[in-house]
Amino acid sequence: MTTPAPTFDNNAFTMLAALLEQWGLSSLSSDVQDMLTAGDSADIVPIKLRQTEAYKTRFAGNAQRIKNGLPALSEAEYLSTEASLRTVVRQYVGAGTYDTQDNLQKWISSDVSPQELNDRMGIYQDNWDLQPQSVKDAWASHGLTPRDALRAAMDPNVTETQLKRQAAQYSVGGAAVKAFGDDRALNADRAMDLADQGVTKDQAEKGYRDIAGRYEYEGFLARSAGMDLTLAEQEDAALLGDQRAENQRKKVINTDNARFQENYLGTQQSLSQSAAGKY
């Protein structure tokens, strides 16, 4: 007895072709056609499709999730997460450079949610992207470019804690550049130290404005008195509330006041004596 040839299910093919289009795997349509022609049911075909290299490449993030001890996402979850991640990236840096399939797979495999990526990109925008060009140029000359910062924001291996620490360092250093108009007060290690001690962006901007406004004058007073008043001491006083550093400032100012009083009174006394001698 001859076995009847399997009949081709057009309805199943239409449904599966639509599924492939959703997955971005329309190139597998001929494979689906062959499977249905061979007698595979519409329930079996998706299982076989998941074994193809094209499918594994398209949903490569899932294989890495499993290696990382994370559960695989369903195709619908994967595609939804992918679309949301792509939207976040384009919102901040546009399309074409960073919304690549490799980056999307990297974030999905590392379980970076769209909200987490949005938070990280917000940190980048607030602390790097919106800085004036003078700050970007100054930091670039010290080895940190905006592109480096953007890559750190997008790198799931850089923890959010590390990213915030770098952002705080950048903001503190940026405040120094804006206040002085150049990078004379920019020191990467010092900026990180101040950030680690809790100096915020707003505090740094106010503190460095105060320092820049008096730096040359108080430095001149210190040199005239044969004393030291370093930038670090000015920073300690203005940004950290260090009493020892503030006392050093006051000592410089008070020494100058005493010298002024001495010179002024000496001059007045000399003038008085000269005037008395005329009579």
Please report, for each region that a protein language model flagged, where it lies by residue.
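General marker for long, soluble alpha-helical cores
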Residues: T2-Y279
